[in-house]
Amino acid sequence: MQKENKQLCLISLGCSKNLVDSEVMLGKLYNYTLTNDAKSADVILINTCGFIESAKQESIQTILNAAKDKKEGTLLIASGCLSERYKDEIKELIPEVDIFTGVGDYDKIDILIAKKQNQFSEQVFLSEHYNARVITGSSVHAYVKISEGCNQKCSFCAIPSFKGKLHSRELDSILKEVEDLVLKGYKDMTFIAQDSSSFLYDKGQKDGLIQLISAIDKQQALRSARILYLYPSSTTLELIGAIENSPIFQNYFDMPIQHISDSMLKKMRRNSSQAHHLKLLNAMKQVQESFIRSTIIVGHPEENEGEFEELSAFLDEFQFDRLNIFAFSAEENTHAYSLEKVPKKIINARIKALNKIALKHQHNSFKALLNKPIKALVENKEGEYFYKARDLRWAPEVDGEILINDSELNTPLKPGHYTIVPSAFKDNILLAKVLSPF
C-alpha cells in the first residue's frame, strides 16, 4: 500500500515490554512516514511509562515538550502505562493531548487516530503472532513478549493495578512468531514479561518456561536467545538447568532479588527467602560462563541499618556482573505507600555506597573478557568508523557494548554472529577485533 503523505513521530518510553507494544502500533501505522523530528510530524505518539515516580515525570515532561514543539494541526497521542494508571484524571491534568489510550488498544491505534477518540479497553493487550510489528533498533535482534500482567503482590509495586493479573500467551503462538521473525532475518531474540518464570502458571502449568526453552531448542530456527525478568519464587533449579543445557539460550540470568535480608523480603512481600535466593544464585554461578544480573531496592520503608549492611556485605561477596540499584519510590495503591519512609538523605548515602560496590564488580566482569575469544552479535555501524556488537550473553542496551574498528577489517561486516577478541575497555565499552563468523 502506498504511504500517506503524513509523518509519524513515535516516542517509546520505559522498558522493552513497552517497546514491543510500540512496534505493534508501528505495524498498524505502516502507511505513515516515520520521523524522529517531532516538530515536523503530523502525528506524535508517545507510549508512556508509569512504573515509578521518575518514569512518570519523564513521560509527563516528554508529552509537554511535544505539545510545545508540535506544529499547528499535529495530533498528539499519549498511550501506555501512565495513561492507563491515571485514566480518570489525566485528561484534565494534561489537556494538551488530543487522544488518550491505555494498555488495551495498541492494535487499534489506527482506528483511534481516524476517529480522534480516546479509548481504554478493560483487557490488557498482549501481542500475538498475527499482530504485525515494525522491529526497531536492529536488523538481527527482536524482543518476544511471552505474557502480560503479574500475580505477585510485592509491597512496592503498582504494576498489577494497571497491567492486571498474569496472562500468558499460548506456546504455539510464540513459536509461530519466532518462526516468522527468523524468516525475516532476526536470529537473536530476548524473551520478556513482567514475570517470565511464571509463564503458563495461569494455565495451571508450573514448568511453562522450561517447555518454551525445550520447544525453541527443538525448533532449531534461532541462533541465540536469552530471558529477562525471572522472579525468585517461581524460578527453580530445573529452570536453571534447562537454560544451561540449551544450545540456543545463553547462560544469562536476570533475576531481580530486591533484597537479601529475610526480614526485608518479608516486609517487601516477596514470597521468597534468603535461603531460596542463595540456592538459586549459587546454582547460576556454577553454570559455566554464566552472566548474572539483578536489581535491588534501597530505602524501602522500615529498612534499618542492620538490614542494609547485610545487603551491602552480600553484594560485595556475590559479585553480580550487573546490578540495577533503585531508590524506593512510594506508589499509590501499594502496601508500602502508607508506611513510614526512610529519610532521603539516608537513602542517597546507601545508594552511593552500593553503587561503589556494583561498579567495582562490573569493572571486573568487563576485565574478565579481555584477550580471549567470545561469541558476539554484530548489529550495525556505530558512526563512521565502528561496528556495534555485544556479547551474546548480554541483553541489548543495558549490559554494555562492543565496538569494532572498521579500519582493521579486510571486508565490511554483515550483521550476525561472530567470534571476537576484546582488547581494551572504558566506560562500559569494549574494543575488539573479529576472528571469524560462526
Curated annotation (Swiss-Prot):
It catalyses: L-aspartate(89)-[ribosomal protein uS12]-hydrogen + (sulfur carrier)-SH + AH2 + 2 S-adenosyl-L-methionine = 3-methylsulfanyl-L-aspartate(89)-[ribosomal protein uS12]-hydrogen + (sulfur carrier)-H + 5'-deoxyadenosine + L-methionine + A + S-adenosyl-L-homocysteine + 2 H(+). Its EC number is 2.8.4.4. Residues 6-118 form the MTTase N-terminal domain. It comes from Helicobacter acinonychis (strain Sheeba). Its main location: cytoplasm. GO terms for cellular component: cytosol. Binds 2 [4Fe-4S] clusters. One cluster is coordinated with 3 cysteines and an exchangeable S-adenosyl-L-methionine. This is Ribosomal protein uS12 methylthiotransferase RimO. It is found in: Cytoplasm. One of its GO terms (molecular function) is 4 iron, 4 sulfur cluster binding. [4Fe-4S] cluster 2 binds at residues 150, 154, 157. InterPro entries: Elp3/MiaA/NifB-like_rSAM (IPR006638), Methylthiotransferase (IPR005839), Methylthiotransferase_CS (IPR020612), Methylthiotransferase_N (IPR013848), Methylthiotransferase_N_sf (IPR038135), Ribosomal_uS12_MeSTrfase_RimO (IPR005840), rSAM (IPR007197), rSAM_horseshoe (IPR023404). Catalyzes the methylthiolation of an aspartic acid residue of ribosomal protein uS12. The keyword Transmembrane helix does not apply. It is an enzyme of class 2 (transferase). [4Fe-4S] cluster 1 binds at residues 15, 49, 81. Belongs to the methylthiotransferase family. RimO subfamily. Its cofactor is [4Fe-4S] cluster. Keywords: 4Fe-4S, Cytoplasm, Iron, Iron-sulfur, Metal-binding, S-adenosyl-L-methionine, Transferase. Residues 136-364 form the Radical SAM core domain.
